[in-house]
Amino acid sequence: MSNLTYNFAQKIRWFRLLAHSRSSKLNEEVALSLLDKLPSKSPVIFDIGANIGLFIKAFNKSPHKPKLIFAFEPSTYVYSVLRLTVSRFKNVQCFKLALDSKNGTTTLNMPLKKSGSIRVGLSHIGEVSKGDYLQESVETKLLDDFVEEMKCDVIDLIKIDVEGAEFEILKGANRTLTEIRPFWFVEISETKGRFNNNSKDTFKKFLDANYAAFYFNEQREWVAVQDYVNENDFLFVPKEMLNGLNI
């Protein structure tokens, strides 16, 4: 599974994650709606914080099947599940990498339950709160640098789910944000105590770059919002692409 040492509870949790990745239909409705809104019907997607690959599975069920998905997951533990989840998809490239505000390395903090198993969905970089953690040194890279290295002139959608490090990614994504102009689907989380910014900074970054913001409500509709109120999953659309958009 990896070169790290895991206890029995963590090994059992790994197999449960793998089983969950095979059976879960989580995220399908929002993923299909996202791809339906994109101008491209064979989009290029960046999945930053891909976790065990549930969004990738959902994207590939769309009639607008992605041309290519770049999947980023820094955790060795989770990455090993991700690779197995997406192994049948020829349009997915996986990278064991944390996109960040600098190139180098950082510490990934994986909170532990009382049983010793890993709380996979809450792994994060930045300051930690009370409790026990499994820590791992992971490679970091600027999003703009990765895009340049891979010669990605077109990106249709960037999905970000990184437990509070959204703004750190955006610090390294100015060219992508202002020149390539993809749609962004971002889970904006409260970042108190982890970084010298907050969720409103992340939201404002998109508005300042001339994006419009939407969220997917309980009626399964995209609703426009002008200001950040509380943490949510937001779709940011370049304003120049709003005309004719069915949203």
Give short role names for the model-derived ranges.
Residues 1-247:
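Phosphate/nucleotide-binding beta-alpha loop and adjacent structural elements of enzyme active sites
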